[in-house]
Amino acid sequence: MRVKGIRRNYQHWWGWGTMLLGLLMICSATEKLWVTVYYGVPVWKEATTTLFCASDAKAYDTEVHNVWATQACVPTDPNPQEVELVNVTENFNMWKNNMVEQMHEDIISLWDQSLKPCVKLTPLCVTLNCTDLRNTTNTNNSTANNNSNSEGTIKGGEMKNCSFNITTSIRDKMQKEYALLYKLDIVSIDNDSTSYRLISCNTSVITQACPKISFEPIPIHYCAPAGFAILKCNDKKFSGKGSCKNVSTVQCTHGIRPVVSTQLLLNGSLAEEEVVIRSENFTDNAKTIIVHLNESVQINCTRPNYNKRKRIHIGPGRAFYTTKNIIGTIRQAHCNISRAKWNDTLRQIVSKLKEQFKNKTIVFNQSSGGDPEIVMHSFNCGGEFFYCNTSPLFNSTWNGNNTWNNTTGSNNNITLQCKIKQIINMWQEVGKAMYAPPIEGQIRCSSNITGLLLTRDGGKDTDTNDTEIFRPGGGDMRDNWRSELYKYKVVTIEPLGVAPTKAKRRVVQREKRAAIGALFLGFLGAAGSTMGAASVTLTVQARLLLSGIVQQQNNLLRAIEAQQHMLQLTVWGIKQLQARVLAVERYLKDQQLLGFWGCSGKLICTTTVPWNASWSNKSLDDIWNNMTWMQWEREIDNYTSLIYSLLEKSQTQQEKNEQELLELDKWASLWNWFDITNWLWYIKIFIMIVGGLVGLRIVFAVLSIVNRVRQGYSPLSLQTRPPVPRGPDRPEGIEEEGGERDRDTSGRLVHGFLAIIWVDLRSLFLFSYHHRDLLLIAARIVELLGRRGWEVLKYWWNLLQYWSQELKSSAVSLLNATAIAVAEGTDRVIEVLQRAGRAILHIPTRIRQGLERALL
C-alpha cells in the first residue's frame, strides 16, 4: 500500500513538473532585448558655441591694417564640402539665432581693438572759432573739376574753417592751428555763430582711426569647431522662421562682408528666385522688415573734391589729421542709381508686400526722423563715411494694379545728395566715438544694393485704412548680419546612441583602445536614412574628428605666427583657441563615456544591460526599418541619462568579475600549487575544513539527541561502543550468570579521524532514509493546498463573472430607463415649444380677427 501511494504521488509530481517545464519554455521563447551602444550616429541638437573665422586675407592689400583683422583667420577651403541631408526637416529661426549675436559682438570687438593703439583726441575738446568755407577755386587747378555742374556745389556752411589753440610737442607752449571740419561734426556753443566744439566731446572719448587703417569689408566665413556643425536651409523662398525641408550641412558659412550701413544693405547675397521679405511679425509695426532682393541695384558714389590733408601735432608722439584745403570747386558728394532698375525693384517689393497686407495701397516715404545714421543712408566709401539723403528713393505710391505715382523727375538716374561725417558714434553706444581722418584726393566707390530695411507706420486705424506707409529703417547692425545668416544654425553632434538589439555581451575581454572620431559632415549625410541603414556606415561616419582637432591646432599656430609682431591675439585668435579647446573637450568627453561603458575603440558595442520596455515599447522592426536616428533620439531622450548610468554600473560590475577571474590565473599552473607563497592559503583551507567537520559533528549530535528524545529515552552515550574483551584472567560469563556487568567497557571498532567522518556520513544517510516519509508528507500537503487553491480560484472567478453579468444587466436597465425618461421629457419640451411658437405665430391673425369683429 505504501509503494502504491508513493507511485500515485510521483504521478502528480510528474504532472506538475511537466506544467512547470512548459511555462519555462514559453517564457524563454520571448527573446530578451539588450542595450547596444553605437558611436558615430547622425544625431544633433541645437547649440550655441564659439565659432571661428576663415578668410582669404592674403588676397588683399597687406600695407594697410584691415579693421577686420582677417589675417588671424584660417584660410578658406578651396573645395568646401556641403552634404545634402535627404528626408530631413529642420526648424530655423533667424530672429533667435546666436550666430547673429556672436557676429555683432565680434565686429564691435574688432573695431574697439583696432582703435586701441590710436590717438585720443581729448586735446581737441577746445573752443573752435569757425567761419563758413567759401566756394573758391585754386588758381592752379581752376579747370580741373568744372566739367559738370549737375553734381551741385556744396551748400554754404556745410564746411567750416576752424581755428583753435593747441598744445605743441612742448606741453607748456600753445600755438594756433586751423582745420577744415564738416558742419555735422561740430556744434555751436551758446548759440554763438562763431564758437563751436566737437560734437561728441561732452559725451564720448573721441579716438582717431590710425592712419593706415582700412574699413574695406573683407568676406568672413564663420566656421564650426570639431564636434559641431552648421545646418543650412536651401529653400529658395524660406521666410526665415519655421521648418525647412531642403537642409544641408556645411563646415563654414559663405563669405559675409561686414558692411556697416543703414537703410540699404550693400554687397550681400541675393535671393535665388524672387524677392523675399522677412519679418519676425508682419502685424507688429515695431518689427523691422528685411527685404532680400533677387537682383542687385548698383549705386555709384563719389566725393568729387580733391582734398589735401595735413598733420597737426597735439602733443608728444601724437598727431591730428585734418583737411588742409580743397583743390578746385567745393562740390557736394553724391550717389547715382539707375531709375529704371530701382523702379523695377520697388515693383517687385510692392507685389510681395501686398501679399502680406491684403492688396492695400503701398506708400514709400522718407524716414520719420532720428539720428543721422537712421535718417540718412550711412555707409563707408573709400574710408570716408557718407550720409546720403534717400528721400528720392522712397517717395512713391503704388496702387492696387502696381502702378505708381512719384514726385521725382524723369532723368535716367536718381541722384542722392550726400554729406560726409568724420566723427562717428560707433554702434549707437554711449561713450565711444571715432574720428575718421580725411582721405586725400577724389573718392569713388561702387556698391551693389542687395537688400532693404523697412519699417511700417502704425496707428489705431490701420485695419480700416487702405494704405500702408513704409519708411527706410536700420541702425541695429544685427539686422545687417541677420540678412546673411538667416539660413544657418549651429548644432552640436551627439555621436553616441543607444538602441535595443538581440545581441548581448557574452564574455568579458580586454579591448585595445584606439582613437576614433566622428566626421560631422560625412556622417550627417545619413541623417535621413533609417537606423538600420545608417548603422551600416558607422566606420565611414567616425573618422575625422581627431584629425579636425589637429587641423585646428595648426590653424591656431598659423594665426599666432601671423600676429607675433603684435604680441597679442585678436578676437579671432582667441576664438581659434576656444574652438580647439572645445573640440578636444567634446572628444575626450565622448571617449570617457565609451571607456566607462567598456566600449573604447568600438563603433558597435553590445552590453549586458537589458532593454526596458518602458523606455520604448516599439518593436525592433519598427525601430530599425522605419525610424531615423533623430526620431529615435527624441523617442528616448528622457531616459538617456538613466541608460547611461545603467551602462556604467554594468561595466563596473563586469570589471569586478574580470578582476576576480584574473586573480584565479595564478592557479593555472600545477607547479604554482607548491609555491611557498600559497602555504598560507593551504593553512586557511585546512582550518576551514576542520571547522566545517566539527560543525557538522555538532549538528548531527544535536539531531541524534532530538531523535532519541522523540523516541522517549536519552542515550547515555552518543555512540554505542562494542564491549572490550576481558583478559584470560577474567572470562566472560554466560547468559544465566550474574556478575558485575556494569563495569564492562566497550570501544569503537576503528579509531581515528577518518572513522569519525565515516560515522557522521553514515548517520546522515540513515537519517535521510528514515525520514523520507517527511518529504512525501510535505509533497502531499503541497498538492492538496494547490488543488484546494485552484478550486477556490475557479470559484472566485465564476462568482466574479456572475456579479459582473448582473452589474452589466443592471447598468443596461438603468440606461434604458434613463433614455426613455429623457426621450419623454424631450418630447414634452418640444411639444410645449411648438405650442408657444404657434401661439406667437397666430398673434397677428388673432389681432386681425379682433379688428374685423370690432369694425363689423
From Swiss-Prot:
Region (Fusion peptide): 514-533
Region (V3): 301-334
PTM info: Highly glycosylated by host. The high number of glycan on the protein is reffered to as 'glycan shield' because it contributes to hide protein sequence from adaptive immune system. Palmitoylation of the transmembrane protein and of Env polyprotein (prior to its proteolytic cleavage) is essential for their association with host cell membrane lipid rafts. Palmitoylation is therefore required for envelope trafficking to classical lipid rafts, but not for viral replication.
Regions crossing the membrane: 686-706
Segments for region (V4): 388-418
Region (Disordered): 717-744
A GO term, aspect molecular function: identical protein binding
Residues modified by glycosylation: 87, 129, 135, 140-141, 146, 161, 165, 191, 202, 246, 267, 281, 294, 300, 336, 343, 359, 365, 395, 401, 405-406, 413, 448, 465, 612, 617, 626, 638
Sequence ranges on the Extracellular membrane side: 32-685
Short motif (Di-leucine internalization motif): ranges: 855-856
Chain segments carrying region CD4-binding loop: 367-377
Coiled coil: 634-668
Annotated motif YXXL motif, positions: 713-716
Record's comment describing the protein's domains: Some of the most genetically diverse regions of the viral genome are present in Env. They are called variable regions 1 through 5 (V1 through V5). Coreceptor usage of gp120 is determined mainly by the primary structure of the third variable region (V3) in the outer domain of gp120. The sequence of V3 determines which coreceptor, CCR5 and/or CXCR4 (corresponding to R5/macrophage, X4/T cell and R5X4/T cell and macrophage tropism), is used to trigger the fusion potential of the Env complex, and hence which cells the virus can infect. Binding to CCR5 involves a region adjacent in addition to V3.
Miscellaneous remark of the record: Inhibitors targeting HIV-1 viral envelope proteins are used as antiretroviral drugs. Attachment of virions to the cell surface via non-specific interactions and CD4 binding can be blocked by inhibitors that include cyanovirin-N, cyclotriazadisulfonamide analogs, PRO 2000, TNX 355 and PRO 542. In addition, BMS 806 can block CD4-induced conformational changes. Env interactions with the coreceptor molecules can be targeted by CCR5 antagonists including SCH-D, maraviroc (UK 427857) and aplaviroc (GW 873140), and the CXCR4 antagonist AMD 070.
Protein name in UniProt: Envelope glycoprotein gp160
High-level lineage: Viruses, Riboviria, Pararnavirae, Artverviricota, Revtraviricetes
